[in-house]
Amino acid sequence: MPLPHRSQQELWVCHLGTLRYLDALAIQEHVRALRQADELPDTLLMLEHPPVYTRGRRSGAQDLPLGEDFYRAKGVDVIATDRGGQLTYHGPGQLVGYPIMRIEDVHRYLRTMEDAIIAALAQQGPRARSRRDEGIDYTGVWVGERKIASIGVHVSRGVTTHGFAVNVENDLEPFSGVIACGLPDVSMTSLAKELSDERLQEQASTGAPALHTAPAPACEPLLACFRKRMAHSFAQAHDLRQRLVSPQRLGIDTTNASRRAERAPLNTSPPAPAEAVPV
């Protein structure tokens, strides 16, 4: 069934909570098939993952110097994927976004994704930047020389899967001891770390005494706040209206333990006004 014109101008945003990586991959493939058939509009899946290392198409054995079994013994799975890029880490407290979108120019899409992340971070405080001119290994978003967001995508029949991961308040230690993003000396950072560092610098410059309890960030809780800003920024970057939808509207069954996508009938009727995301 063709999409109504109204839906063609929307970005559907779906919050999936915390999902195992392979279950999220199955959901992406399910939603991608629907998007390729024009049974739903461009869609942004937002979620977190339990600890996992994922390999992109350019990742090699050198990225995990101690071997995959060592990392699995520490409780971190290792999964090969069809996305671009090299090795990265996902874990609790990191915001992962999987846009399932019809695109024409993948390079423009990557640049727009970087710009959307930069804009969302700017609303929270850190001045982030792209290093796109320094080569493919520098794809992503940086605060100074520190990487705060990774990007890797796959395009099939004009529709994207995979996407971005922004370090919000996740543990950065798992990035140590691996070669993340193909950059042996890369320094990773997070939104929480940058906000904390900014407060310390402000205290040092004003001579104010350091407090055991730092002032609360502008919006709490941090991850939920940034997720809202990221969805708004991403929709705005693509000139689309964002609309919150449930997993069931996408034909996703999240009631079973595995959280796998099911081929349930898609509800293509316009979302009720109550589901509109305030922006």
Which residues are covered by each model-predicted region?
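A hydrophobic, small-residue-rich beta->alpha segment in the mid-to-C-terminal subdomain
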Residues: 173-235
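Beta-strand scaffold of nucleotide-dependent catalytic cores
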Residues: 150-152
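N-terminal lobe of the biotin/lipoate ligase/transferase fold
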Residues: 1-142, 147-148, 177, 201-210, ...
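Conserved phosphate/anionic-ligand binding catalytic regions in large, soluble enzymes, centered on
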Residues: 157-172
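Generic non-transmembrane alpha-helical segments
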Residues: 116-124, 225, 229-240
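Residues immediately flanking
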Residues: 48-50, 155, 168
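A short beta-strand motif that forms part of the nucleic acid-binding face
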Residues: 59, 155, 166, 182
